[in-house]
């Protein structure tokens, strides 16, 4: 399991931090956790190819975690890429299919992909859920941000695990997902002196 933080920022643009996204290489798969603005370019900077992404896992629907879906779909339509692109899966909170249709609507056909190319897996938002994939399992739990927000625990076949959450306040869901995990990655959106209930600060995340 190899992990690369492509972006550790927030909705506020910063020269030194890109928006949230993490690349995980696992069991021969490339998994993207969130896809905030600039993620496709960050992949290129890191020497990774967006066309090699097998799974995109989305924590919630705010723009700083989803905006580069637009770039990703449009870039995937580039004919030399589209001809050789293998199928990929988007794993996201319940309601994602509707969200995606609304996101694509202003662009018309320019974000459309062949049906064979993309599948989606919607996870329950009001309770824990899990999905098994080739070589790993994704467990999810509701977290304290929006009604659709989820935290995740990814476990490979050897038992290694990583827990990830985008924006969240302290909640039992993330505590349980993180229990005995090998690595925990949490978004801490505010400094300690500006802490709010639905987003962690460094002290709250620690």
Task: Give the predicted meaning of each segment.
Residues 1-164, 169, 174-176:
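Binuclear metal-dependent hydrolase catalytic cores
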Residues 170-206:
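Cap/insert and terminal regions of metallo-dependent hydrolase folds
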């Amino acid at each position: 399991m190899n992990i690369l933080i492509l972006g550790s920022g927030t909705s506020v643009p910063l020269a030194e931090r890109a928006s949230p996204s993490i690349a995980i290489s696992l069991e021969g798969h490339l998994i993207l956790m969130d896809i905030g603005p600039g993620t496709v370019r960050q992949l290129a900077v890191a020497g990774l190819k967006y066309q090699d992404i097998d799974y995109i896992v989305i924590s919630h629907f705010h723009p700083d975690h989803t905006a580069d879906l637009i770039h990703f779909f449009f870039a995937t339509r580039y004919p030399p890429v589209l001809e050789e692109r293998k199928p990929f899966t988007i794993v996201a909170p319940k309601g994602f299919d509707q969200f995606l249709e609304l996101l694509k609507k202003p662009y018309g056909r320019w974000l459309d992909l062949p049906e064979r190319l993309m599948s989606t897996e919607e996870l329950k938002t009001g309770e824990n859920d899990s999905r098994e994939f080739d070589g790993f399992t994704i467990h999810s739990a509701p977290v304290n941000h929006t009604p659709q927000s989820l935290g995740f625990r990814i476990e490979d076949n050897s038992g290694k695990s990583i827990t990830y959450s985008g924006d969240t306040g302290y909640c039992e869901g993330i505590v349980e997902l993180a229990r005995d995990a090998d690595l925990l990655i949490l978004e801490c959106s505010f400094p300690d002196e500006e802490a709010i209930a639905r987003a962690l600060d460094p002290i709250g995340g620690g």
